[in-house]
Amino acid sequence: MEQTRRARLTGLTAALLTVAAILWTLFASPSIGVVADGSYASAAEGLALRYAEESIPTGQRVEDFAYEDTAYSTLLFASRTSVGAAVALVRLATHPFGLGFSTRYLAVVYALLMGWGAYLLANGLARRSRTAAILATLGLPLALANPAVIGYLNSLYAVGASIAYLLLFLGATVYCLCREKGCGVQWTLLVLFAAQLMLRTMAQMMVLLPAAVLAVVLCAVHSCPGRAERPLHAA
């Protein structure tokens, strides 16, 4: 259908602009990052990472880390926050090749996740409102290219993960609810997956638990195959 094709094109445009804006700001501004302090070292330790250098002066920007011995399952399932899931992805792509960990790699993972969320959000909105889809497509890159946002993405702090997972959750919810009824339970599962990642980023995100539960319930009712509209037959 023409509407579906247009919605997909809008979503793809939003995704490309969002990822490009984040990565451009990240790599064009080498000074954006987090400086060393005691709490940052503790955050790294909780993710099986340590400073790549033996001694780093307090106040120096830190991006590079070395890996501690740990199992991937520990990062994925035993980590206190869902930041561990993103760190595990970076570790899987770098550690086997003898590469160290960089928060810039982590920022790229977050950028791709937010690109996915932007695609779902703009795709869903385009099925209902062209104006809303255009606003989302143009507004997301402008908002996310903020140096303050990039600073959190280029760090081990949970704020960066919460931003990425929140956008993925919003995009998945809007996409599911804007599709036709009875579109399939896989979209509800995507919303549930994004919700649990979002809620596990840090304790403060638990205030969104009621909204997450409501979104999952609404998506389940909307996407259930039994809810598909059936054509009326003349008597």
What residue ranges belong to the model's regions?
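Hydrophobic transmembrane helix bundles of membrane-integrated enzymes that assemble
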Residues: E2-S29, R80-A235
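Extracytoplasmic loop-helix module adjacent to an early transmembrane segment
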Residues: A20-H95
